[in-house]
C-alpha cells in the first residue's frame, strides 16, 4: 500500500457544511413532512440574469459553428474578460491592473485553497478567528499548522481574534507572519474594514516581508460610501497583496463557476538563498500546469456582467438579497438578539440566545423552528456562541424563517 499524506488526519472531524447536511438529513428522515428553511450555506437562489443568459446562449451557438468553435482556451482567461475585469473592477477605482496580472479560475474557494501551493511549507500563517474554514484546512493539508489542541486551535497557526470587543477587526499580530489571510466584506461576520486599517496591514506586510491574501469575494455587496472595495486602493499594496474576486455571489455563478485572482507584477517571494522570484510568474506556472481554463461559454457570460444592462440586472439581484439581510437584521434585533453585519455583506452574525453553544443553537433552530443556519464555532474557536445566517434565500422563506425564530 502507498503511504498517505498524514496531514489530512489532522483535519477537524467533518468539514463544517457536510456536518450541517448530515444533521439536517437525520432530522428530515425523522420528520419527512417538515418544511425546512435553509439560511446556512451561502448558495444563491435567484436565476442567472437575462443579459448573462443571452450571452451564454449566443456563445453556445457559436460553439456549434465551424468558425465559432472554441476548444482549449488560454488558461489565464480570454482577453475579452480580462480587459473587462481590469477596466470595470479596477479602472473604475482608479487602479491600474494589467491583463497579465489577472487569472480567471473556476472559483475563489479553489483559488484560496490553491494559492498556498506556491509558498514554502514552513511559512507561518496568520488567520482571523472566526475564519472561512478553507484558509485553515488547506494549510492543514499542506502540513503548515501543527497539531490541533484541546481549544480547537492549531499549534503553528497565528490566530487573530475578531470579536465584538474589537469590532470584529483582527488585531495585527506582534509576531512575524509570512502569509496573512484577510476577508472583506467578511465571511462569516458580515463586517467591513476601513482604508486606514488596510494601510496598517500593508505597512505590517512591508515591514515583515509578508504576503496578504485578500479575499474580496463579496465586494459587490458594499453599499456604504468610504468602504474600501479593493486592497489596491492602498498605496503600496501591489507590492504585498494578492486579491481574490468571484462571480459566484455577485452574479449568481455558483453553478457556472467563474472567479479570478489578481497577482501584481511587483509582488515577489524569495528562495531560501534570498533570491527574489515573481509570484505572478510562479502562479502562472502552477495555473497553466494544473488548470485548463474556464469554458468559453462561461467567460462570455461573465463578460456580459459588465455590460450596462448586465450591471443593472445584477444590481437588482444584489438589492433583493440585501433587502433580505435587512429583514433578518431588523427582525432579530426586535426579538432582542445582538446582531452584526448584514449592511455591506449578505451575512448576519448573531449572538446565540440563552448563552447556548453554537451547535446547541443550531439544533434548537432546526428542531423547534425548522430553520438551518451555520454554527459560529465552525469558523473557529472565537465563533463559539455565535451563529451565521445567510441572506441568499428567497424573500418569502426569509420572512417565514424570521417569524419562526422570533416566536421561539
UniProtKB/Swiss-Prot annotation:
| Residues with N6-(pyridoxal phosphate)lysine modification | 249
Residues reported to bind substrate: 15, 42, 109, 132, 187, 292, 388
| Keywords of the record | Aminotransferase, Pyridoxal phosphate, Transferase
Q: Name one Pfam family in it.
A: Aminotran_1_2
Q: What metabolic or biological pathway is this protein involved in?
A: Amino-acid biosynthesis; L-lysine biosynthesis via DAP pathway; LL-2,6-diaminopimelate from (S)-tetrahydrodipicolinate (aminotransferase route): step 1/1
Q: Does the keyword rRNA-binding apply?
A: no
Binding of pyridoxal 5'-phosphate: at which residues?
Answer: 72, 108-109, 132, 187, 218, 246-248, 257, 292
Record-annotated membrane-spanning stretches: none
A Gene Ontology biological process noted in the UniProt record is: lysine biosynthetic process via diaminopimelate, diaminopimelate-aminotransferase pathway
Protein EC? 2.6.1.83
Q: Name one GO molecular function term.
A: L,L-diaminopimelate aminotransferase activity
InterPro entries xref list: Aminotransferase_I/II_large, DapL/ALD1, PyrdxlP-dep_Trfase, PyrdxlP-dep_Trfase_major, PyrdxlP-dep_Trfase_small
Cofactor(s) required for function per UniProt: pyridoxal 5'-phosphate
Report which superkingdom the organism of origin falls in: Bacteria
The UniProt catalytic activity note for this protein reads: (2S,6S)-2,6-diaminopimelate + 2-oxoglutarate = (S)-2,3,4,5-tetrahydrodipicolinate + L-glutamate + H2O + H(+)
Which NCBIfam families does this entry report, sorted A to Z?
A: DAPAT_plant
What is the annotated role of this protein in its UniProt record? Involved in the synthesis of meso-diaminopimelate (m-DAP or DL-DAP), required for both lysine and peptidoglycan biosynthesis. Catalyzes the direct conversion of tetrahydrodipicolinate to LL-diaminopimelate.
- Assembly with partners or alone: Homodimer.
Return the similarity comment: Belongs to the class-I pyridoxal-phosphate-dependent aminotransferase family. LL-diaminopimelate aminotransferase subfamily.
Q: Which PANTHER family match?
A: AMINOTRANSFERASE (PTHR43144)
Tell me the protein's name.
LL-diaminopimelate aminotransferase
Provide the gene name from the record. dapL
